[in-house]
Every structure is written in structure tokens, then in C-alpha cells.
């Protein structure tokens, strides 16, 4: 199988440390995956039993299959929020205060429709904060500063807390950075070089 992955930005996995992003790209290339950045598909047409994708960089890719992942957008338009007076941001997310109340006090929102960190455990934590605030008599806010995130890639990657760039911005050069690579024990037996 030959795989080409296009990404419209300068690199994938926005929000992760640059060295992690670069490491994953290197490992993917070792597996034979062709990565093309700053590129998008202009058009896909069927030619016989194949597909031809015209790219905005002038190249063409002939392939058996195209998967076009366009990102996520909250499905908040046209469900009556505007009629209820709820303020939506330009991207369709719902504007809320620190206790998840919209500008209409009886309407609260949490999870992916906020456009913050779109992870199930974050939405669960937000739901618990709302329950504590409304029913527990304990106004509760959510701290988004140390949310773990994982990508089920090969190799898998994860992070928690600030990226190096964010840490440098917040603490100038008063940080230490240590990098280490290791080969998982299971790979030593199979002679897999993945790190």
C-alpha cells in the first residue's frame, strides 16, 4: 500500500511540541508514508477505476481512494439558538462564561460546541463542573492548563501541560528541556526500529 498524506498547514498536530511533530513525521516517512505539507486538493475526478486528485501546488496524484478530512465544526446553526438569543461566535461555537452560561442565563453549553479542547474527558469534567454549580451549591470552574492528549499513531504520542514554546513564552528562558529516545523492549525482539 502506498500512502500519501496531504496537510494544508506547515505541519500536522497543531498544539503539540515541534519536536514531537517532527519525530512522528520522521517515523511515518520511515514506514514509507509520503507527507506533503502546505497543500490541499483542488479537485478529484474519476478516471476509469482510479481517482485523480489535482493539488493546489500543481501536482496530480492518481490513487484508488481519497479520504478528505475537513476538520470539525459545531452543528449549532439552524437549531433555534439564534432565535433564543444565544450568542454564537463566527465559527459557530457558543460563547459562555467560566460557569458555562451563555448570554441567555437559562442556556448553558459545554463540550465540543465551545471550541476549546475537544476531548471526551474535558467535556465530562465540564459537565461535572456544571452539575456542582447548579445542583451542588459549589460554583466550579475548569482548569484547562494540564489536559493530557494522545494520538493513536505509530508510534503513539501524547502530551500534557505546556508545549516548550508556551513554556518559554510564559517563563522566558527559565526552563530546562530534556529529550530522550528509547526503543520499546517489544521492538528489540522483533528488530523493529520504531522509537
Language model features: what each stretch is:
Residues 1-52, 56-57, 117-124, 132-166:
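Rossmann-like dinucleotide-binding cores of NAD(P)H-dependent redox enzymes
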Residues 46-51, 104, 191-195:
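A short, glycine/Asx- and small/polar-enriched loop/turn
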Residues 112-119, 153, 183-188:
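Glycine-rich phosphate/pyrophosphate-binding beta-alpha loops
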Residues 38-40, 91, 178-180:
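Conserved beta-strand termini and adjacent loop/short-helix elements that scaffold enzyme active sites
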Residues 87-90, 137-146, 171-178:
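A short alpha-helix-loop-beta-strand transition element characteristic
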Residues 33-34, 107, 175:
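Short, conserved active-site loop motifs that form the nucleotide-linked donor/cofactor pocket
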Residues 59-85, 159-195:
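C-terminal catalytic lobe of FAD-dependent flavoproteins
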Residues 60-138:
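FAD-site-proximal beta/loop scaffold in flavoenzymes
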